[in-house]
Amino acid sequence: MACYRLIIHGRLPGLNEYIDAERRNRYLGAKLKAEAESVIRAEIAAQLRHVKIRQPVRMLYRWYESSRRRDKSNVCAYGRKVIEDALVGAGVLENDGWGEIDGFVDRFFVDGENPRVEVFLCTADAPGIESWSQIIAWEPPPKKPRRKRAPGKKDAGK
């Protein structure tokens, strides 16, 4: 199975931000989308330089947000569309329709120090589809629990 990984560093605009921009001015919404696509295309050029996928793919999105402030659907709804449009614009995918994208799965994590989106593009008709389920089930390693402070002088008399 051919799988490709694309990492988009930073935070993409959410659906609410796009809707707000469109309501203010339709050109502002178009500008927001163009800026997001430009950032994504730069990442594609650096990471997927000569990749051209001409068969259906299954896509796994791993959304790493800096906090839980934005709701999950706001994070991924607009982001998926912009990412897929950038992949088509860069020539990695021929189109983003039903014939080219077999399905997608979203996973969400919090990483305050390194917000990003990891996109896996896996060919859908390749043998060894069990590795696709392994990718979906993958979890980042757990963070080490914080050590509790030893009681200080203030707490000693309690």
Each language-model region and where it sits:
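Catalytic phosphate/metal-binding cores of nucleic-acid and nucleotide-processing enzymes, i.e., regions
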Residues: 1-158
